[in-house]
Structure formats: C-alpha cells, structure tokens
C-alpha cells in the first residue's frame, strides 16, 4: 500500500507550530493528592447550567486561550470567583464547588470542566450532577460527588475548609461513599 504524507524525523523536528495571540497550549492538571484538602470557593443553587459555569456569547472568542477564558468561570453567578480561585490555586489551596440539584445541565460544554480545572477546582459536591457534565468533570480530573443526604448541602458555606482523606485510594477502589470533613463547621459529610 501507498503511504500518505511520510516525513522523516529530521524534517519533523524543524517544523514549528505557530499559535496566534489568542491560542494557548492546553493546560495540564496536577495529580489528585492522597488526601484532598481545599476550600469551598463557591456555593451555587439548583439548576446551574454549563452556561452559568462557562459563559458563551462575547466570551466564547477566548475558548482557545484557557487562561483568558477562565477569567469568566461562574461570571453570571459570582464575578469574583475566578480571581478568588486563581489566588487560592497559586497558594496551593484546592478549590471545591458546592452545588444543588442538576448541576451542569444544558449544552455539553467541555470548557465548563476545563476552565474550572485550570483554576484549581478538584471536586464538585452536589445534590445531583448531570450525566454528561459529570463525565466531562472526570475527563479533566475533577471528582463529581453527590451528597448521600441532600441536607448536607445546607450545612456547607462558602470559604469552609473541607478535607476528603484517602480520596485517591477511594477513587482507585471505586468506593461508592466517602467521608468528607468540614473543618470549619466541625461536621462530617458523606459523599
């Protein structure tokens, strides 16, 4: 058979990829720590759509520049979220999201997981998470948790410090329930 486009290694090594001023390299995620300690950086209500998480419209032009596009995560709900999350990420503090029912409904927008990942979000704890959005979260290294008791959502507050000990082992074992500890409120939450 004939091969299409065979290039030798020397020629490939000389090829450069040019990106325009608005195209950045895709970000990589850090590995999940053994024990996840973080801060609830935002608490959102029920029925948060992917458009609430990652606005489109005039912001969509930045989709190839994840650092820039990430400046608008949760903008319709909390315009200061991305600044807060980036500051915590830069201090090596993981960001956590607390959410109500049907988190991530709407269009399957990968950037609604990619941009929060870039900002250091490691887990979403929700009453329920839409199936496709949950898959996108997993694909970008964000753990989608649902509360065993939906009422636990009510006890969590923005800025609470939360720890999920043994998270990496729990993921590898496929545990169906994990314990989280709200260190600020002194309460245990089952996810």
Which residue stretches match the model-derived regions?
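Non-catalytic terminal/interface segments that mediate subunit docking, oligomerization
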Residues: 7-125
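Short, structured coil/loop segments at alpha-helix boundaries
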Residues: 66, 78, 85-86, 130, ...
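Active-site lining segments that contact anionic ligands and/or coordinate catalytic metals
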Residues: 12, 37, 94, 121, ...
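A generic structural signal for short, non-catalytic loop/turn and secondary-structure boundary residues
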Residues: 8-10, 35-36, 90-91, 138, ...
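NTP/phosphate- and nucleic-acid-binding module
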Residues: 30-32, 49-50, 57-62, 68-70, ...
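A structural-propensity feature for long, helix-poor, extended segments
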Residues: 129-183
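Short, small-residue-biased leader/transition segments that mark boundaries at the very start
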Residues: 1-6
């Amino acid at each position: 058979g004939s091969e299409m486009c065979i290039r030798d290694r020397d020629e490939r090594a000389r090829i450069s990829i040019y990106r325009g001023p608005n195209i950045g390299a895709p970000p990589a995620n850090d590995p999940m720590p053994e024990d996840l300690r973080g801060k609830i950086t935002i608490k959102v209500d029920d029925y948060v759509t992917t458009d609430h998480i990652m606005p489109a419209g005039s912001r969509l032009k930045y989709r190839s520049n994840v650092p820039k596009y990430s400046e608008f995560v949760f903008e319709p709900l909390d315009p200061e979220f991305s600044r807060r999350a980036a500051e915590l990420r830069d201090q090596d503090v993981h960001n956590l999201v607390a959410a109500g029912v049907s988190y991530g409904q709407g269009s399957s927008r990968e950037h609604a997981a990619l941009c929060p990942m870039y900002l250091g979000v490691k887990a979403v704890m929700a009453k329920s998470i839409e199936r496709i959005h949950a898959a996108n979260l997993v694909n970008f290294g964000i753990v989608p948790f649902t509360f065993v008791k939906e009422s636990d959502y009510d006890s969590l507050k923005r800025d609470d410090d939360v720890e999920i000990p043994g998270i990496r082992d729990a993921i590898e074992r496929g545990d169906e329930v994990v314990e989280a500890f709200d260190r600020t409120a002194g309460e245990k939450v089952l996810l």
